[in-house]
């Protein structure tokens, strides 16, 4: 699908824009599933000031969506109308240390934040080592693993409103819940401050190595996948419910339920976004019939089907 080109009009409104603004840019290469249609406009800001300028001059009727590295995302096949914003590491990926505090931009990889904390002998962020996303996504969904979550270590988050106004949220204001936060979807996170505790670096590194070894053993990390597909229901594991329903290895087109971990869907090579989403809905339907549990998507699905 090709959208009407809105880029010339937007550029005329924003003569001082420094970031890159492209029309009808494919989003498939920007997602781990490697599927999906184009963005009507794709904006890569130079830095936070540039993003604030862009948002303050963007007509309110134009929808906005922000993506990270695309590790927890299905972009539907017909793409997204409006503007998709992708925060680059340059300008949004800096990580700094201040005592037992870690400051990270929204485009910083979770794994790099864990590594920076470990190098500074700061414990508490080891769980990020096994999460294949960015800090912006971690803030949005209260990312967690191995019994720890973002809300356990967050002090405050920085953000911009849809109109480009700067905002700050403390831990309480984030209204975290399991794999979610209470912040309006129109808000774009730009960075965060975390606090850990000083500990022996060897012990921190050992825990991170355990996280990585476990992940390589039980997750299909070398496949085209979006990570955990469904949230774990209270007191239960999604993968066990999926396995019990007989869906391990089940396929729709080029999409497959991973044989290695049932809560991972994979693109075997030629899948469409429709294949993957249809497979996910088939899993939900089968689990509902088998166990009565209504699995909820953890992976974000956006765009026109």
Swiss-Prot record:
GO terms for cellular component: cytosol. Cell wall formation. This is UDP-N-acetylenolpyruvoylglucosamine reductase. Its EC number is 1.3.1.98. Disulfide bonds: none annotated. Keywords: Cell cycle, Cell division, Cell shape, Cell wall biogenesis/degradation, Cytoplasm, FAD, Flavoprotein, NADP, Oxidoreductase, Peptidoglycan synthesis. It comes from Nitrobacter winogradskyi (strain ATCC 25391 / DSM 10237 / CIP 104748 / NCIMB 11846 / Nb-255). GO terms for biological process: cell division; cell wall organization; peptidoglycan biosynthetic process; regulation of cell shape. Coiled coil: none annotated. The active site is at 179, 228 (proton donor), 298. GO terms for molecular function: FAD binding; UDP-N-acetylmuramate dehydrogenase activity. It catalyses: UDP-N-acetyl-alpha-D-muramate + NADP(+) = UDP-N-acetyl-3-O-(1-carboxyvinyl)-alpha-D-glucosamine + NADPH + H(+). Belongs to the MurB family. It holds the Pfam family FAD_binding_4. Residues 35-214 form the FAD-binding PCMH-type domain. The gene is murB. Its main location: cytoplasm. Its cofactor is FAD. Pathway: Cell wall biogenesis; peptidoglycan biosynthesis. It is found in: Cytoplasm.
């Amino acid at each position: 699908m090709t959208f009407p080109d809105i880029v010339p009009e937007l550029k005329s409104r924003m003569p001082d824009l420094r970031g890159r603004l492209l029309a009808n840019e494919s989003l498939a290469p920007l997602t781990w599933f490697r599927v999906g249609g184009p963005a009507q406009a794709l904006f890569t800001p130079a830095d936070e000031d540039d993003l604030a300028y862009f948002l303050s001059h963007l007509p309110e009727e134009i929808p906005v969506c922000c993506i990270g590295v695309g590790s927890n995302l299905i972009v539907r096949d017909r793409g997204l109308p409006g503007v998709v914003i992708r925060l680059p590491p340059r300008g949004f990926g800096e990580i700094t240390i201040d005592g037992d505090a870690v400051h990270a931009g929204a485009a910083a990889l979770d794994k790099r934040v864990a590594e920076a904390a470990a190098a500074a002998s700061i414990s508490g962020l080891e769980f990020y080592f096994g999460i294949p996303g960015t800090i912006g996504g971690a803030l949005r969904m209260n990312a967690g693993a191995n019994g720890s979550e973002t809300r356990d270590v967050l002090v405050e988050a920085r953000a911009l409103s849809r109109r480009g106004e700067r905002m700050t949220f403390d831990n309480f204001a984030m209204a975290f819940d399991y794999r979610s936060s209470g912040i309006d979807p129109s808000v774009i996170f730009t960075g965060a401050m975390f606090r850990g505790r000083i500990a022996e670096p060897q012990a921190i590194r050992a825990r991170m190595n355990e996280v990585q070894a476990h992940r390589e053993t039980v997750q299909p990390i070398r496949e085209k996948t979006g990570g955990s597909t469904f949230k774990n229901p209270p007191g239960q594991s999604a993968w066990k419910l999926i396995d019990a329903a007989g869906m391990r290895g089940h396929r729709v087109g080029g999409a497959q339920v991973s044989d290695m971990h049932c809560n991972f869907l994979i693109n075997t090579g030629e899948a469409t976004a429709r294949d993957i989403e249809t497979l996910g809905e088939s899993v939900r339907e089968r689990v509902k019939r088998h166990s009565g549990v209504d699995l909820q998507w953890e992976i974000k699905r956006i765009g026109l089907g």
